[in-house]
Each structure stands twice: as C-alpha cells, then as structure tokens.
Swiss-Prot record:
It comes from Drosophila melanogaster. Substrate binds at R77, H388, H482, H491, E517. SUPFAM superfamilies: Creatinase/aminopeptidase, Creatinase/prolidase N-terminal domain. Keywords: Aminopeptidase, Cytoplasm, Hydrolase, Manganese, Metal-binding, Protease. It is found in: Cytoplasm. Its cofactor is Mn(2+). This is Xaa-Pro aminopeptidase ApepP. GO terms for cellular component: cytosol. GO terms for molecular function: metal ion binding; metalloaminopeptidase activity. The keyword Cell division does not apply. The gene is ApepP.
C-alpha cells in the first residue's frame, strides 16, 4: 500500500536549503539511514525515520533525498515490498546488483562539484560513513554532519515519543556468568591492546554484559543506553528512572559496582577520557560516526568488541536454556500446525493474521515465555514470495488448501530465543513446488550435516545450502544463516553465513548458535523456506584439519518438515536417513510432553508428520 510522501519531501527540501554547514547554508542531499543512535537492526517507532520519509517499512534500507530526486537503497529481501510501498516520488535502487551504484558513487556522479551531503552523525556508523566520504571527496563533494535531525523537525509533534521502559534483571540461573567474570575477560583483552577504555553502543552487548534486559524496542529485550568499560569502572549511561528496583542487589550478586550517568552525557564522558588519559580507546567500527569522531584517530582501536564475541559463544547455562526453550517452542509449533491443518481441512476461515495470532496464543502458554522475537511472517500463496512479508489488513490472505503457506516465527523466553520457518501445503502441491521444496531441503540437510575446520568463516559454507538449487538455475536472495541471541536479538553477530563476507566474522566456533535457512521464492506465486537453529559442536572425522579442530552442526529446533512436499527421488539415501533421523528425534523429544499434557490431538498429528519416507 502506497502513501503519498510529497508533502514530507517538500518540507524536508525546505529544511535542506537552510541547513547550516560551517559558515555556509544549504545541503544538496540528505541521507536517512534505517539506524537509531545505536545502529540497531530494528528500531522503536520514534526512530523509524526512513520509514516515515519514504513509506517503505522494511527493516533494511537507506533513503537519499536530493533537491530533485528521492532514492531508496535496499537489498534483495525487500525488492518486492519496496515496489509496493514506494510512491511515484521515489526511485528504487536494488542494492546488491552489479548494475546498482553505491550511495556514494551515485551522489558523486549526480551532484555538482562543491556540494554538501548532510546526515545525522549519530545515525550513521563510522564503517558506512568513511566509504561515502571517500567517494564524495573524489568528486570534490563533502559528507557533513548535521546537528539536529531534519526528519524529526519535519515529523514534529506527530513523531512517537522515545520509549523508556523499565529494565529487568536476568538472574544467574538464566545468564550463567556474573558480570564480574565477564569484566575479567574484557580487562585482559584491554590490557593486550594497551587500551584504557572500551566504548559500547550496541544495545544487545550492553544488556548481555550487565545481565539486564529491557523492552525499549519491540521484540528485542534491550534498553537505550551506552556503556564504558575501564579497568576499574563500569559507566552505564541510561535514564536512571528505568533501573530495576533490585538494581543494588543485582550488583551485589554480580560482584560489581556500576556508576550510572545520564544517557545524553556519553559524548562528554568520552571527551573527558580522551583528555585525561593517554592510552588507546576501543570502539567498534559499527559505532556511530559521532561517537568515533570524538576519539583522535591515533588513539582508536576500531575492532569488533570483545563483548560481541563473548556473547556469541554461549556458556553452559545459556546452551541448556537454548535447548529447553526450543523444545517448548516446538510443542507450540506442533499444536499450531495441527490445529491449522484441521481448520483448513474443515473449510474454516483462517487468514494470515488470525493464524499468526493463534500461534502466539499457543506460545504464550509455555513456561518462561516473554513475547515474540519478531513479527510473525504468516504468508499464503503469493505473499510468501515477499521474503520478509508481514500480514496487514490490506494484504491479509486466507490460508487454504490451494496455496503454499510459509510461516517464519519466533519467541523470546527467559532462557533462550527461537526462530523457525516451516513451509506447508494443505492440498496438492505442483511438481515444480515439490521440486523447489526438495532442493531447498537438500541444501538445508547438506549445510546442517557438514564438518568444517574451526574458525572457518561462515561465507565459506554458504554454497553448501545453495548447490541443489544452483544445479537447476535457482537461488534465493538472502543469507543462509545468522547468529541468535540468548533472550536477546533474534539476529546477532559478529558471525553469519551468506554470499558476502561478514566484515567482523571471527570464524565459526563451538557453542555459537546460528540459523540454517535456505529458501526459494517464485515472484507473485509462492515462497519456500525451511529454517532451523543449529548449535556448533565438535565434529567427528578421521583427521583434525592439522589440529585446527573439527566442527559440525546440531539442530535444536524441534518441529517436523512436511514430507508431502518432498520428491523423494531427488534425495540421496544419506539425505533420507538424515531426515528420518531428525524426525525420530522430534518424536522422541516432543511426544512424551504431549502425552503428559494429554494433547492427543497434536500427538496424532505429530505421529503422522514424522513417519519415515
């Protein structure tokens, strides 16, 4: 559904003409990133500036507005969605295609020499800022920070307020490690780098390190804050009114003292550290240009933070929580799919939105449930071909026995975060649909069963998931795997699996948890994706990669994959064995729980779904 952006763009261009750049007045272009001041993947409503100015509400994209043109860069997950949501004022720039120039290259080519390009320096990471700055400089143009966000000024009183919800403590029974022990590890790494301080702006890193959780961003258990870690101080920049009532006790239980400062004073404190200390200051390259520029270049260590890597490698308590939460989640998924199949077979009216609500209701009954981990992708027929589709009133479609149904969903539990996709057909799939599904499944089985050297980059494994599709000229326009937080963000770095190299990927290591999610999308017809969460565990092979160590994956998602969609002749004997073994594991894990709960209806459905092929 398109909405007019004409008035918004007119007002923004008026402000661009008056924007102050030193002694000059006026900018030729204004960049509107998706990010908030913490470079979060998802934003609270207050920070949805790119969505406000463009009408496109996908999670990834950058808007560029010049005096005459408005352009939106987004990746392959969102091409279809952007086409449907952008009005005639906008040009869609398909990021990732070889013919699409970068933002900096386009601006350098299309703006007059001497032009200024403005951006809010808090919303653009240093890593993104520098190449744009370099490309503009080559055309004698400048990228300049603009104080005061122009979109906020256009939005005015209609802009939703900044969220400021209460923070909760995460007890050791769920976090597994005290803050003091985490601090010891960070101190050692600071010492090795000859650094005095670590500046942390990523919200999930702060929440994990401090064993705290929040709800300032929907689906993401984080809270707006900054953190500075030194050898002898923990400085938390946060609205003190958000702190939990047991914050003093929380510090005692974690053997630390945390100094609380106003959220907005982070810049002042960084400048103070710069002026009073001589050693280096560690800050992630993904932090904002604003924060990074406060630190002289000669004093910066710009690397992924030690907290980011520590967080990705789960401890024993987190591992147990991940496994247990996925079992409870699997029960809810089976209850939903059993119910849904029965409703469709009866001819009952179930649409994408009511289906998503029903799934949420099943999850909400499970122990330690805290909410969803993202908006459920409940997609029937052609809606499934929109990779990150979310049902709305104007797009809501009935789930029926004539179309493929794709359901990508997840939940937050006190002891883990889930993310799972299943693709089903409640009638008779076409031969092409069955072939596409089987090739997606082959890729998932290949990826999930591979053995690889420790610390290999995720990109190296990506083609394993695509090969069966590539064999017949098919592919998918998204990554194969992302990290998953522990009662934290459903998308977590620094590792990942995709065609592109993740710049901060430290290599895959034991007890990281990532997704395994190949797919295929036939534009305007259907979508297929099969997604599990896998744990990286030691692999058993004859040799040991010259003592590097062997790793493999262990699937922890517990939900059957619809065998009706499979063309068995396309599977090897080994693949059939892998699938049957997985289904036996699902049965052995979930059937005792369903029996104990007296849920014979779901138990009967599960028994049917896990029959060997």
């Amino acid at each position: 559904m398109k909405r007019s952006t004409t008035q918004i763009l007119t007002r923004l261009r008026e402000l661009m003409l008056r924007a102050q750049v030193g002694d000059s007045c006026g900018i030729s272009a204004y960049i509107v990133p998706s990010d908030d001041a913490h470079q979060s993947e998802y934003q609270c409503q207050h920070d949805e500036r790119r969505s406000f100015v463009s009408g496109f509400d996908g999670s990834a994209g950058t808007a560029v507005i010049t005096t005459e043109t408005a352009l939106l860069w987004t990746d392959g997950r969102y091409y279809q969605q952007a086409e449907k949501q952008l009005d005639s004022n906008w040009v869609l720039m398909r990021d990732g295609l070889s013919a699409t120039p970068s933002i900096g290259a386009w601006l350098a080519k299309n703006l007059p020499k001497g032009s200024f390009v403005g951006v809010d320096p808090r919303l653009l990471s240093f890593r993104v800022w520098k190449p744009i700055e370099t490309e503009l400089s080559s055309a004698e143009c400048q990228l300049v920070p603009i104080e005061g966000n122009l979109i906020d000024e256009v939005w005015g009183e209609d802009q939703p307020p900044q969220t400021s919800n209460k923070i909760i403590t995460l007890k050791l029974e769920h976090s597994g490690v005290t803050i003091a022990k985490k601090w010891d590890v960070v101190r050692q790494q600071l010492k090795e780098k000859n650094a005095d301080a670590l500046v942390v702006s990523a919200l999930d890193e702060i929440a994990w390190f401090l064993n705290l959780r929040g709800s300032d961003i929907d689906f993401n258990p984080v809270f707006f804050s900054y953190l500075i870690v030194t050898n002898d101080e923990l400085l938390l920049f946060v609205d003190s009114g958000k702190l939990p009532t047991d914050f003093v006790q929380h510090q005692k239980e974690n053997n630390v003292q945390i100094s609380v400062l106003p959220y907005a004073s982070i810049g002042i404190e960084i400048s103070k550290i710069v002026s009073t200390r001589e050693s280096k200051i560690w800050i992630a390259p993904t932090s904002s240009y604003y924060l990074t520029a406060l630190i002289p270049k000669s004093r910066r260590i710009q690397e992924v933070t030690p907290i980011c890597v520590l967080k990705a490698i789960k401890n024993d308590v987190e591992i147990a929580g991940f496994i247990n939460s996925h079992i409870r989640d699997g029960v809810a998924l089976c209850q939903y799919f059993a119910w849904l199949e029965d409703q469709v077979n009866k001819g009952a009216e179930v649409d994408e939105m009511s289906g998503a609500d029903k799934l949420e209701s099943f999850r909400s009954t499970k122990d330690k449930y805290m909410g969803l981990s993202f908006t459920t992708i409940s997609a029937s027929g052609p809606n499934g071909s929109v990779i990150h589709y979310h049902p709305k009133k104007e797009t809501n479609r009935k789930i029926n026995d004539k179309e493929i149904y794709l359901c990508d969903s997840g939940a937050q539990y006190l002891d883990g975060t889930t993310d799972v996709t299943r693709t089903l057909h409640f009638g008779e799939p076409t031969e092409f649909q069955k072939e596409a599904y089987t090739r997606v499944l082959k890729g998932q089985l290949s990826f999930g069963s591979t053995v690889f050297p420790a610390k290999v980059k995720g990109q190296v494994l990506d083609t394993l998931a695509r090969k069966a599709l590539w064999d017949v000229g098919l592919d998918y326009g998204h990554g194969t795997g992302h990290g998953v937080g522990h009662f934290l963000n459903v998308h977590e770095g620094p590792m990942g699996v995709g065609i592109r190299l993740m710049p901060d990927d430290p290599g895959l290591q034991a007890n990281m948890f990532i997704s395994n999610e190949p797919g295929f999308y036939q534009d305007g017809e259907f979508g297929i994706r099969v997604e599990d969460i896998v744990q990286i565990v030691p692999g058993q092979v004859a040799h040991n990669f010259s003592n590097r160590g062997a790793l493999t994956f262990k699937t922890i998602t517990m939900c059957p994959k619809q065998t009706k969609m499979i063309k068995k002749e396309l599977l090897s004997d080994a693949e059939v064995k892998l699938l049957n073994s997985y289904h036996q594991q699902v049965w052995d894990t979930l059937s005792p729980i369903l029996s104990r709960e007296g849920d014979e209806f779901t138990l009967s459905w599960l028994k049917k779904e896990v029959q060997p092929i």
